[in-house]
């Protein structure tokens, strides 16, 4: 019976994780400047939940693939520069 591959401490797995972070950041930096406002607000709201981060990046990669020559619409895609309905989630006191 075959054994499941084990994760070795300090091996290539961590290095791949670091590269994944940079790829995700580059994807977000590119797409957040080009997507329509409604989609950006939806993604910013989804990013408040850590479990949805991979889904946002996956949707962003698909959007990039479908809209290869999209023009830049804004200088920055962060929540501070683009406040919207997703921004009010943090202001609620429970």
From Swiss-Prot:
InterPro entries reported in the protein's UniProt record: Lentiviral_Vpr-like
What is the recorded name of this protein?
A: Probable Vpr-like protein
Intrachain disulfide bonds: none
According to its UniProt record, what is one Pfam family this protein matches? Lentiviral_Tat
The keyword Cell cycle is assigned to this record? yes
Q: Does the keyword Cell inner membrane apply?
A: no
Query: Which compartments does it reside in?
Result: Virion; Host nucleus
Q: What does this protein do?
A: Seems to function as a Vpr-like protein, since it mediates host cell cycle arrest in G2 phase. Cell cycle arrest creates a favorable environment for maximizing viral expression and production.
């Amino acid at each position: 019976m075959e054994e499941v591959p084990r994760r070795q401490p300090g091996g290539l797995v961590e290095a791949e994780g670091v590269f994944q972070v940079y790829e995700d950041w580059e994807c977000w930096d590119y797409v957040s400047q080009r997507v329509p406002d409604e989609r950006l607000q939806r993604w910013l709201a989804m990013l408040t939940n850590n479990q949805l981060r991979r889904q946002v990046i996956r949707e962003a990669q698909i959007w990039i693939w479908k809209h290869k020559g999209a023009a830049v619409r804004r200088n920055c895609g962060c929540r501070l520069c683009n406040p919207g309905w997703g921004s009010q989630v943090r202001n609620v006191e429970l």
